[in-house]
Amino acid sequence: MTIVNLAAYHFVSLDANEQWRPLVTARCNELGLRGTILLAPEGINLFIAGTREATDAFIAYIRHDPLFEGKFATLQFKESLSDSQPFRRMLVRLKREIITMKKPAIKPELGRAPFVDARTLKAWLDRGHDDAGRPVVMLDTRNAFEVDVGTFDNALDYRIDKFSEFPEVIDANRADLEGKTVVSFCTGGIRCEKAAIHMKEIGIDNVYQLEGGILKYFEEVGGAHYHGDCFVFDYRTALNPQLQPTENVTCFACRAVVTPEAQQSPSYVPGKSCPACAQAASAA
């Protein structure tokens, strides 16, 4: 059976999340969906999967049900397919932020961050500069272990371990960004949008987010100016520029990404250990 995987987020002011939670949970269970939906005062973030019929019904529900007062009417979804269900259960969770930066919540009514679409970005990277002639800096806002699976060519990578470290890292390295066009990017768009807003707030000019993140870029233009795959937070571990699962796996013990080459190591025991585990043990 083909399973449809949906990902979406939207920054919008929400104040009825506690009332919505049981109703959204019930509807998802009725449809046989699995995954996670996060609701916070600053918006919604979701990763769900199910049959085509179920996911189509969910999209209609979240966009048009009177319960939501039109707040999700323009919610855009990124879609991929898999042969099996990547999630074990259905969760609707209430959070302070839909992506944790430990900064005051975004004020959606003030407008979203400036963005650049995939085709325009590719044209900039082909030329080596943006439409105004400024050099383009690609800024990876993901965690270090995600970056190691794949990233844009010559991207800035500050080796953060969690997104809440981003503001401090940017404060310490803003000289790298001054006088350039900065394009922040992440898997699906949520971290790079929040990152772009933060950079604008602290006075860094010419900042954009990559619309839809890496996955939308793959969908629109493939893997141009990108090397490797894109880490995803489900059983597939990583997707290639054709949005197909790769042979990378996640170590059950330490959650490290194990490449096909690393799977040949004697230290790799499926479900038990990997070379990263062995390295950590030897360093202890």
Swiss-Prot record:
The keyword Hydrolase does not apply. Residues 132-226 form the Rhodanese domain. Keywords: Oxidoreductase, tRNA processing. Its EC number is 1.14.-.-. SUPFAM superfamilies: Rhodanese/Cell cycle control phosphatase. CDD domains: RHOD_YceA (cd01518). SMART domains: RHOD. Pfam families: Rhodanese, UPF0176_N. The keyword Cell inner membrane does not apply. InterPro entries: Rhodanese-like_dom, Rhodanese-like_dom_sf, TrhO, TRHO_N. It catalyses: uridine(34) in tRNA + AH2 + O2 = 5-hydroxyuridine(34) in tRNA + A + H2O. One of its GO terms (molecular function) is oxidoreductase activity, acting on paired donors, with incorporation or reduction of molecular oxygen. The active site is at C186. GO terms for biological process: tRNA modification. Catalyzes oxygen-dependent 5-hydroxyuridine (ho5U) modification at position 34 in tRNAs. This is tRNA uridine(34) hydroxylase. It comes from Burkholderia orbicola (strain MC0-3). The gene is trhO.
